[in-house]
């Protein structure tokens, strides 16, 4: 569903910007296929400024459909969105994007990369980053971005446990809105406070007690 390496390249080198709106975007009513088929019924979700949402559900339940609609609405609302797909179609392109950045901006991204456990100097001289290195580099770019929203689809793919723990800390410090698709329960518990559960053609909204920021 994501054509996001273009989005990623455009987002690199910026920092979080608060749009000032309390509700960034809403999705309400039925979500239909172009042919008219109802894919999700009676949806009623709103992403608020600074809200941290996990989108959960079985494979094929409609998570990608909900995210596609959410991203379209965010685009219509002119929100700056940082997006990480489940898989990067061209990991080497991420590295090339970083190499072409202004030195000050590149330094900021590489500094964030170091906090994710990667030696920036080693990555910059490689011919082709590993899947894990490319993913961390993409995450470093997004975490250094001017974005009011991060949308991350299975960000722990290709990451080892220490890297996942560093990502948990980085997302806990992120002060924009976050929409996270993950099967990693520890990451979800550390980074999100609300769950949008997609099942049986519907979206159930649940406030997750005991998570950060939840009474």
PLM regions with names:
Residues 17-215:
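ABC ATP-binding cassette signature C-motif
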Residues 1-26:
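Coiled-coil termination/hinge junctions
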């Amino acid at each position: 569903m994501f054509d996001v390496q273009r989005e990623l390249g455009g987002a690199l080198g910026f920092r979080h910007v608060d749009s000032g709106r309390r509700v960034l975007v809403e999705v309400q009513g039925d979500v239909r296929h172009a042919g008219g088929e109802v894919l999700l019924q009676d949806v009623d979700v709103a992403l608020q400024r600074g809200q941290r949402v996990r989108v959960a559900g079985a494979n094929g339940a409609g998570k990608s459909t909900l995210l596609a609609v959410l991203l379209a609405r965010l685009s219509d609302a002119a929100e700056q969105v940082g997006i990480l797909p489940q898989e990067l179609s061209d990991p080497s392109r991420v590295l090339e994007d970083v190499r072409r950045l202004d030195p000050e901006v590149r330094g900021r991204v590489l500094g964030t990369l170091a906090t994710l456990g990667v030696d920036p100097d080693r990555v910059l001289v490689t011919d082709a980053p590993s899947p894990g290195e490319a993913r961390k580099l993409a995450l470093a770019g997004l975490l250094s971005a001017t974005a009011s929203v991060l949308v991350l689809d299975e960000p722990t793919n290709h990451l080892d446990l220490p890297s996942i723990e560093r990502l948990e800390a980085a997302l806990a410090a992120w002060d924009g809105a976050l929409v996270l698709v993950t099967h990693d329960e520890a990451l979800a518990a550390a980074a999100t406070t609300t769950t949008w559960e997609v099942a049986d053609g519907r979206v159930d909204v649940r406030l997750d007690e005991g998570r950060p920021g939840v009474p």
